[in-house]
Amino acid sequence: MASKKQSTISLFFSSQTRKSPGRDAKKNDISSSPFNAASSTNNSIGSTPRVSPIAKFQYNKSTSTLHENTNPRVKRVSTLNVDVEKEHKKIKRARSTKLTPLESQILQLLSEHPDKILLIQVGYKYKVYGEDARHVARCLNIMFISSSTDPTFSYCSFPENRLHINLQRILNTGVKVGVVKQMESAIIKEVDKIGKSGDLMKRELTGVYTRGTYMNDEFIDSGVNSPEQEELGYIVCVNEISRYQFAIVAIQPLTGEIIYDDFTDDVSHDELETRLLYLRPSEVLLLGCGGNESNNNNNNNSNNSSNNNDNGTDADAQNQTSTLQCFQKLVNHNIKIERKPKGLNNLKAVLNAAALNFYRELLEPVQVCVSELVKYLEEFNLSNIFTVIENVSKFDSKKTMILPASTMLSLEIFQNSENSTTKGTLFSLLNHTKTPFGMRLLESWVSHPLIDKDKIEERYQAVEDLSTGSHFNDCLSRLLQKIGKNLDLESIAIKIHYSTTTRSLATKINRKDIFMMLLMYQSALQFVSQFEKTIKASNLSPLLKRVLDNLLQLANTDTVDRFMDMINPSYLLGEQQNLHQSSRSTREQKVKFFNLNNGFEEINRELAEIMNVKMLLEEELVKVKKLLQRPQLNYVTSNGEPYLIEVRNGKAVESLPIDFIKINGTTTVSRFRSKEIAHLYKMKQYHEEVLNNRCDEAFNTFLNELDSHYGFFQGITKNLAVLDCLLSLAAVSNSNSNTHVKPNLSDELIIDVKNARHPIIEHLRDGYVANDIDIRYDSNRVLVITGPNMGGKSSYVKMVALLIIMTQIGCYIPCEAATIGIFDSILIRMGASDNLLKGRSTFMTEMLECSNIIQKLTPRSLVILDEIGRGTGSIDGYSLAYAILRYLVESKLKPIVLCITHYTGLLSETEDEKFDKDAKDENLDTGDDVVKSYYMGYEEITQPGQVFPEIVFLYNLCPGVSNSYGLQVAKMAGLPKKVLLEAYLMSSVTDFD
């Protein structure tokens, strides 16, 4: 019954809600829009069911199995249910045991944050307690120190300067980590007399991270320069509205990009898988799980639905499996599951009016995804990503070529089939970008080829303009090279935006990165200003002129110059020259970041105080010299302790005044401070701490001012990214090693290419054999290709598809001449593989992909079928191959079809015999003689005494039909002669066609 239908996700996962102390979860109906709720008078953010504790999985692609995470909080995973262990066991302490203030503070922190591993700063180390410490010790290969009195206080620790490196290693195990820092200085407490001298140091949670949200935030105090940022996957929220209806919102924390979509899928979830393959998420949050009917169930019905055995349960369970497993196949780290949310936050506290109005225009299921992501990201201080609506776009497949997941995998566009890296892929061939933001834009271009002829021509003209060896092009290339791969302007700008939410985040942004960002923006604007006359006088392509005009308009403001005047370029340029060395202390960078001649009175005041204390210390040294009658005496520094008076042991020590305080010493010397020197040194430390705070406050104000110009900086970055991509395509098009030509675009559906070459294979091996492609809509739109195994059939059809993609990206293609029409989709069924994770056999996978192709057909589709029907018996396989091919031939949509087969009998059915002229299916159009047969060329070589001939592959396409020569290929593979002879005898008396 529909009312008792089990929700998709809940069949496999149970998610327990952990309630925070003193807070009740606000319960609202999911049907109420979070954006309408935002206009209510109650501005507080209500508590909702948390996504944790949740099970986290790791997927091993080589074995297609699910492994339980090493997180000690998670129990073993059963087949149909995941029980999540309580994350912190309550340990009963003996009543006689008295807790120290630090232990009480640690217990309080652990109880307030039970869903995280806490790294707690204690002095100059970070400590992890309890069972979490055992997990971290294994992860970092450090010592685990067990407590004899209470397991809660067992711990492991590491130095504070290792925080960034160790944090990354812990996050890679798929857990959520919180960083707790000391929020006050002991010296400030002492001098300002804040509290008692023995009071506990204040500690606060300053950052929460997962692998998908960590952006090198904690490297600032690690004593190293900014490392290269690992490219993060998207954080994706999917709302499963009904069995085949989905809404999706994805955010990229590193760039601020937001993508949304709502779509209808089928039983194979091909649409969902295509989006996930493009997004490559690092974290997924699942909502909904089962459709509107589940909303009408009361709690009892929902809880008991898994026990129902009414009709359709097995089918539903199969579909539910594929929904969840679609994520488990593509997400290597965290899959977070929630049932239908019962409460939605009031987003008015997070989003501004413009953002709220924008999101109200979206469909309600998309709004729910936005609301849940805002709630989820609040803990990571990333929720204000949704305030920049300029970064929001729709995953719109109607404006670009459709490349389903199966197509991208078969053509190896982004990852190869051997080891899932980019080596040997189309993207690796095209990627000559010089900047990270340019590379990301090129990924978007490759995955979304254009279908508008005018826009493709515009891109070709821009590539042609940038292909000349002009002075302008050389300077532009050097500018992008100067920015380089290690400076991600887009990422730095969005980090500045995040920092405006929480003050503590401002201290996690590298000042050198800020300076280099401004310097590169200044260089870019100076570059276009320098060539302004050239740009305006040149007859540039519309696209290139539009991009350069945008940059010229931005260059006419003094925004970047004003910010550069506020900082100290002489110091920072010296730092930049030592960019790959740990040159100067973080504190020195803070103090010398600003140009103190332009204001900053509080910083100048503290610097003056420090200078005054230093003068007093020198005066005190003069007094000590007179006292000890040592005119050559100077301060020494030992073990990090400065301003020490060093005296040889013996009578000299005994004669010192009684108020001299011994700091350290050796067997021969002792080191002291007088009472006044100790006091002055303490005052110096105090003013240095205050100076540090004043610098942070000034920097935070500076970042807020920068963020107010986020759109301005983003405009520069986006235009530079377009130039970077165009230069990358120009580099491919101007390849010196091989001929590349600009194809002529045709309104007709035609593929006419002379001496075409496979763009990837020609770079991997020598002696590549070029082939002509001559496919015309009205004469031979269906090619049935036979020929020997390993003869190059698959490579040929892949070459056709790749050349079309390159054409519609705007890149020259490897051939001598080409005329190509515009395609709106490339649909491929290729390869023989099962999918154990989804419970599909090889043949089931094959048929589902064929079904998807038929559903997505358009009059401008290119369809590639590789050996349809080989996953089942010969008779059924042959019959299905014939029926599917006939459907594609007779369909009124009339796509171009390339069909590889070893069923040579298909040719007699499709070519020599006319189809039934009386076919009554209104979707079929019979009678067109458009099916042509081809085979991959070869030569037979017969040696005396051989039972069957050997073959030599020629790799050229020839008209006609050919056998498969499987026995010859088996011989090449090294099968024993006895086996080959037996196979030959069997084949001579058996005809499987």
Curated annotation (Swiss-Prot):
Keywords, sorted A to Z? ATP-binding, DNA damage, DNA repair, DNA-binding, Nucleotide-binding, Nucleus
Q: What is its main location?
A: nucleus
Indicate, by first and last residue, each region the UniProt record lists as having compositional bias (Low complexity). Answer: 292-311
| Location in the cell | Nucleus
The segments labelled Disordered in the record are 1-50, 290-317
PANTHER family reported for this sequence: DNA MISMATCH REPAIR PROTEIN MSH3, DNA MISMATCH REPAIR PROTEIN MUTS FAMILY MEMBER
Q: What is this protein called?
A: DNA mismatch repair protein MSH3
